[in-house]
């Protein structure tokens, strides 16, 4: 099982690199998405190709389609084939995608700015806040820790940087062939968005999903 998770992770890392190569000013966003999906299929296709005694192969491939979301589009933008939108210098671009091997899923997300210019001000603050919150959550994902306390930590980091956590975005546990499990870590609690506190358990797998904004969230 662990080996299959590692292979899936290697595949999403390769796919992310393929997407990044397409993220240049003037290039079509849809082409970047297509490059990610094609890379996942190509990379996962290198493994577990022998058939079992019943003639079946291990299932593998895209677990979450490549999404490329620009500027105020929060996430999960996967345009149709005919979409003509292109990247522009200075665009803030969020990439997210996922691959699986035998149902064991690995996901990946990256944020970049088109053009490679130095990022400053509020844009730098929000990107650093999301990165730091992710690093802290990884350290806090230990057996016995509370999902509610982890969520509160995310909000605390955002406050320190003067930015907002995007409401409605949650971190889910994952199981085989299940990308959105029942146990969640809320990035931001609200009257409309609540979850009972639960303990992190040994051998659980989580897909961190932390999104922050310079707006109200």
PLM segments and residue spans:
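Active-site neighborhoods and metal-handling regions in enzymes and metal-associated proteins
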Residues: 1-217
